[in-house]
Amino acid sequence: MNAKRPLDHFRAFARRPVGLTAIVSRGDGSWKRPARLLDLGLGGACMEMLEAVPNGTAISLAVEAPHLWDPLFLEGEVVWLHSLEGAARLGVRFYHRSGRTLRTLTELLEAEAYH
């Protein structure tokens, strides 16, 4: 049987398409850059930036969402990179340091306001 597999077949957590903005900063705080999240899940995200960030780079994201009072702060690591003309698309694996962050991310994924 040759059924087409869904895109999330290799992920532990499904992703949802989003159109959210974020500020990405390097883990050591040496720079901050704007980004646009393309998809988001409990385990990570795909985003576009104007410049490439190497695989293995520790980053922090401050995600803006219409229904949140404050940005959602997430920590992670760049796990893949595709260079585009004038931009870069990258994948991030999240490291949830607290249940509060995970709970807020779950609420964000359940909300309809950001679609």
Role assignments for model-derived ranges:
Residues 65-69:
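Short, charged beta-turn/beta-strand-edge "cap" motif at the junction between a beta-strand
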Residues 33-35, 74-81:
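Short beta-strand-centered aromatic/proline hotspots
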Residues 16, 29, 55-57, 70, ...:
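Residue-level preference for beta-strand/loop junctions
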Residues 81-108:
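C-terminal structural segments of small proteins and small subunits
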Residues 1-40, 106-115:
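N-terminal helix initiation/capping motif
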Residues 72-74, 90:
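PAS and PAS-like sensory/regulatory domains
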Residues 20-60, 91-93:
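Short strand-loop-strand
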